[in-house]
Amino acid sequence: LPEAMLVDWLRVPTDRRMSALFEAFRRGYSIEDVRDLTGGVTRWFLHRFEKMAAVETEIRAAGELGMTPSEIQPEEMRYWKGCGFTDLHIADALSGFPTSGFKQLSKGKDEFAVTSRRHELSIHPRFRMVDSCAAEFAAVTPYYYTTYECGTKSIGVDYVPNLNLSKKKRIVVIGSGPIRIGQGIEFDYGCVHAVGAIQDLGHEAIIINNNPETVSTDFDT
């Protein structure tokens, strides 16, 4: 990515900005440099991006020393996952981000190898309840997110489902993901109606989505 284009992506708030923030810290930009270019993004967020870029460099360095997914130690896997890296990103970084692309990673070095190692180490995400009232008062909702956590002591509440509470059949609805500005919400609308139809039939509906700002992920859906 040319430097001038990176600067443009930092200055203009579009869907490219998050990738641009990460790339800027990869290239050694300081917190203040990035803050000035973005017009004042809160330092708290910038520090998180800077940290992720530093950890990515650590993963890549480990790969340069010959580490393969099968050699990842438990504390390393927990830390990398807790910092927000996907299994695919870890595999790609260990391989040095080859120009051929992550799809061409060889067996034993690909995403599946990292996932297999993570399962072997019994490292899985936790389910945490979303505080829909921002700590203003206690709230219990059937609204959860997954996390591996890292760095700071958790104040979240783990969700441990009691599958014996209900004998109803459970059906999972896969959400449509992020919705861009200008795009219709018909896919999300369809998910909500699918949930309603499942409930009308007497079953339990579980929706899995990765868009916290849309109707299908509202706590009362």
Describe these PLM feature segments:
Residues 1-221:
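ATP-dependent carboxylate/acyl-activation modules
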